[in-house]
Amino acid sequence: DENENLYGPNENKAKAKDLTAGASYLTKEAGCTKLQAGCTMYQAYN
């Protein structure tokens, strides 16, 4: 299917980005438990 060839790799890249973002989010969340205000500022700038 031509569409599968066009969109398949992009979907895989999107999934990889989602996983990376998810890991980053969890890392930020872990830091948030210690410094809530600092984390809020950190998230606002990143």
UniProtKB/Swiss-Prot annotation:
Keywords: Cytolysis, Hemolysis, Ion transport, Membrane, Nematocyst, Secreted, Target cell membrane, Target membrane, Toxin, Transmembrane, Transport. It is found in: Secreted; Nematocyst; Target cell membrane. GO terms for biological process: killing of cells of another organism; monoatomic ion transport. GO terms for cellular component: extracellular region; membrane; nematocyst; other organism cell membrane. GO terms for molecular function: toxin activity. This toxin is a potent hemolysin devoid of enzymatic activity. Its hemolytic activity is inhibited by sphingomyelin but not by cholesterol. In erythrocyte membranes, it causes numerous cell membrane ruptures. It also exerces cytotoxicity to different cell lines. It exerces a positive inotropic effect. Also causes hemorrhage and necrosis by dilation of the blood vessels in the skin, and vascular leakage of fluids and rupture of alveolar walls of the lungs. Is a potent ichtyotoxin. May act as a pore-forming toxin. This is Toxin Up-1. It comes from Urticina piscivora (Fish-eating sea anemone). The lineage of its organism: Eukaryota, Metazoa, Cnidaria, Anthozoa, Hexacorallia.
